[in-house]
A protein has these predicted regions:
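C-terminal segment of classical bacterial N-terminal signal peptides
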Residues: 18-29
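Surface-exposed, charged secondary-structure patches
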Residues: 111-113, 121-164, 216-225
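Early exported N-terminus immediately downstream of N-terminal targeting peptides
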Residues: 38-123
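Compositionally biased, proline/threonine/alanine/serine-rich low-complexity intrinsically disordered stretches
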Residues: 28-54, 58, 208-211, 215-225
């Protein structure tokens, strides 16, 4: 089993934590057709994250042998869950920061798709090292400034170890909720990659960086600070 460095482990945890919130966005969008239904028990982002944690962890555990043997099946599972709940375009604009001002929706989408696909290729297999015996405890749900959405603060509880703090930043997308940033132990998914790609984006266009991510010439890298 590969030993993850602290930074790489943090990203693997962020990906795993993101998967834990995957099904809620879809189930909420499908199961809550009327605005009034949003007040129903279990409709909050916190409850949706909590309710679906068990299913995702059980899937990773029950299919571990299959995923170890068939990495294509793992990638399909990871990509499917990730695509369901992660607001790629909004997250991409956050990662681009000042470089995204005035950028076309098409360029932002291309960058977001390339970044997500690169992450899945590089770090998806790290989920095979993930401790599926973890439990999740929701600590709080609080509104983000300027009505941007909500922050769901949680902890991953592990036997014999300190709880791992995980915060989800979520926003309304259509009739459901989607995650646009995950913070594990205070490390932000968005901030990590905003810093990493800043120098590239100073020298190249968004389309060029997206193409190089897609081709593998540059990579979303969490192996060093």
């Amino acid at each position: 089993m590969t030993l993850l460095t602290p930074t790489r482990k943090t990203l693997a945890l962020a990906l795993a934590a993101t998967l834990l919130a995957a099904a809620p966005a879809l189930s909420f969008a499908q199961a809550q057709p009327a605005p009034a239904a949003a007040s129903m028990q279990g409709a909050s982002p916190s409850q949706l994250v909590l309710d679906n944690t068990k299913r995702v962890l059980e899937t990773l555990e029950s299919r571990r042998a299959e995923f170890t043997r068939d990495r294509a099946a793992l990638q399909k599972f990871v990509s499917g869950e990730f695509n369901t709940m992660f607001d790629r375009d909004y997250a991409a604009r956050q990662v681009l920061g000042r470089h995204g001002r005035g950028a076309s929706d098409a360029d932002v989408k291309a960058f977001g798709d390339a970044l997500a696909d690169n992450l899945m290729r590089r770090y998806g297999s790290s989920l095979l090292d993930f401790n599926t015996q973890l439990r999740v405890r929701i600590k709080s749900e609080s509104p983000l400034p300027r009505g941007l959405g909500v922050k769901v603060s949680s902890e991953l509880l592990r036997s014999g170890g300190e709880p791992i703090p995980v915060d989800y930043l979520m926003r309304r997308a259509g009739s459901g909720w989607r995650v646009f940033d995950v913070m594990v132990e205070g490390v932000s998914f968005v901030q990590t990659f905003r810093q990493q790609f800043d120098s590239e984006l100073q020298r190249k266009s968004i389309a060029q960086v997206a193409q190089e991510l897609r081709s593998g010439r540059i990579a979303a890298d969490a192996s060093s600070d």
